[in-house]
Swiss-Prot record:
Name the record gives this protein: Alpha-neurotoxin homolog 1
Signal peptide per UniProt: 1-21
Lineage summary: Eukaryota, Metazoa, Chordata, Craniata, Vertebrata
PROSITE patterns: SNAKE_TOXIN
Family: Belongs to the three-finger toxin family. Short-chain subfamily. Orphan group XII sub-subfamily.
One of the record's GO molecular function terms: toxin activity
InterPro entries noted in UniProt: Snake_3FTx, Snake_toxin-like_sf, Snake_toxin_con_site, Toxin_cobra-type
Length: 78
C-alpha cells in the first residue's frame, strides 16, 4: 500500500511538472497584466511603427519588421 501511494505521488509530481511555470507580462494595446505560462517561455514582440510591444507566453517567430525577444525568467519580458 505504501509503495502504491509513493508511486502515485511521484507520477503526480512528474505529470504536473511544477518547476516549469513562470509569470510573464501579457499586453495587447493599452492593457498590461501578468499571466502564468505553462510553456516556461515569455516573449516581447516589437513591430516597427507601433510604439507599444506585444507581450505574452511562448516564442513566436520573427518576421520582416518584427523583432521577437524570448526569455525564460519570471517577468523577464517587461
Amino acid at each position: 500500500m505504501k509503495t502504491l501511494l509513493l508511486t502515485l505521488v511521484v507520477v503526480t509530481i512528474v505529470c504536473l511538472d511544477f518547476g516549469y511555470t513562470i509569470v510573464c507580462y501579457k499586453r495587447h494595446a493599452s492593457d498590461s497584466q501578468t499571466t502564468t505560462c505553462l510553456s516556461g517561455i515569455c516573449y516581447k514582440k516589437i513591430t516597427r511603427g507601433i510604439s507599444r510591444p506585444e507581450m505574452g507566453c511562448g516564442c513566436p517567430q520573427s518576421s520582416r519588421g518584427v523583432k521577437v525577444e524570448c526569455c525564460m525568467r519570471d517577468k523577464c519580458n517587461g
